[in-house]
UniProtKB/Swiss-Prot annotation:
Residues 1-11, 67-374, 424-429, 497-510 are cytoplasmic. One of its GO terms (biological process) is positive regulation of urine volume. Keywords: Cell membrane, Endoplasmic reticulum, Glycosyltransferase, Golgi apparatus, Lysosome, Membrane, Transferase, Transmembrane, Transmembrane helix. Residues 33-45, 396-402, 451-475, 532-552 are extracellular. This is Hyaluronan synthase 2. Its EC number is 2.4.1.212. It comes from Gallus gallus. The lineage of its organism: Eukaryota, Metazoa, Chordata, Craniata, Vertebrata. Its cofactor is Mg(2+). Pathway: Glycan biosynthesis; hyaluronan biosynthesis. The gene is HAS2.
Amino acid sequence: MYCERFICILRILGTTLFGVSLLLGITAAYIVGYQFIQTDNYYFSFGLYGAILASHLIIQSLFAYLEHRKMKRSLETPIKLNKTVALCIAAYQEDPDYLRKCLLSVKRLTYPGIKVVMVIDGNSEDDVYMMDIFTEIMGRDKSATYIWSNNFHDKGPGETEESHRESMQHVSQLVLSNKSVCIMQKWGGKREVMYTAFKALGEAWNYVQVCDSDTMLDPASSVEMVKVLEEDPMVGGVGGDVQILNKYDSWISFLSSVRYWMAFNIERACQSYFGCVQCISGPLGMYRNSLLHEFVEDWYNQEFMGSQCSFGDDRHLTNRVLSLGYATKYTARSKCLTETPIEYLRWLNQQTRWSKSYFREWLYNAMWFHKHHLWMTYEAVITGFFPFFLIATVIQLFYRGKIWNILLFLLTVQLVGLIKSSFASFLRGNIVMVFMSLYSVLYMSSLLPAKMFAIATINKAGWGTSGRKTIVVNFIGLIPVSIWFTILLGRVIFTIYKESKKPFSESKTTVLVIGTILYACYWVLLLTLYLVLITKCGRRKKEQHYDMVLDV
């Protein structure tokens, strides 16, 4: 007992020292600005800080590659399909077409005897259409439905404690005695919906799979996640490869699709190698039910800065598994398609909400670094503080640099993005990943200010993404982007005005002309390729079926 406590203290001290030393080292490298290579007039330079980031990308890609090799070997692993699995679907004002596709994909799941529980967040007449779709797809004679005037935490109007307790027991009994169940309940948010499913299922099931109502599951998705949990009893949760269903609907959904591939197949695959995936996504995840019931109450009642948390449910669910010392994994063998915003403003609000939960959960996650591999500490420091270093770099270049420094920065952003996207194209075997280099511009122009705004408003619970049946546009996300553009564009105009009064030397003029031409040609080429791809795939999309082939 004392020995275990002593080892725990040593691990806490060790990971804390490692994390602090890493942050101080990176900060020192950034401040000192030591350059390995630099040309006259600083037209090009490569320093220590850049080398650290480049090394991180190489190491991350290497471990992701090794994890994918392990996944391929697991194809031959025999599995007994004798464990019980329950699928929980969270629904809120869903687009009828997406909901139908979701439920049809659920019916095609190959795992035997899977129980399906769909909980609808809302019990008004406007929500009944989702229950009707459920009974239509799952079969009226094979499914049970219940319209609940309350939920597990809120009583209905005029309801007593005893009647509330009886209604909870009725919901639990309904779920346990039927293979397919749909429950409409009083609105309370996604966490309330998930809580209802978890509590109603009880501890009778081995594994619980989670899914959103806009998600289309691959038939083998459940089998592949069960396989990961069966291979190692110390794996508490596993997520799959989430791809974009509506990626050809707009430029924002298309760029999101290539970003998703990088996030899952490079970043999370690398985390999976060390058993510390930091977010099992809501569209496709599976947990050991025994673990869920150890922390479901604490998960539901999570508070931050004195307020109950109303977003970041999936990330906190993952963190709760990690807090118990269990590993979290990712498997590319389990796949799904899900909807993503096609409007810029809705996407921006979604990213701001996700950034809020990321920074909040970063603090919670830090308490459990000592229970996992050092990679968890290392990556948390690198990814957590990278936006701050990047903002400092941008402001420094725009306010202290010359016009060619600004141009060089723009070229460097695209060059780094092109190198990453080329490597991703090699790993995926699909040239479409080259468009990932365009996402870097979206990151610099929109995600950076959104992340800072997320930190400034981290305790505000409102304005997440709306339901898909009725899209609500919220303009508040434009505030940080507008401020960011004003700061940078104003300085660019001032720098051009100031330097135009002095004649450029021949070498500077040459650099500016060549750089501008290269930058313009790069954009013309990629935008042309994008238009060709969208025209070609847009025609195919009308006849496209999403039964089996997900990676298209």
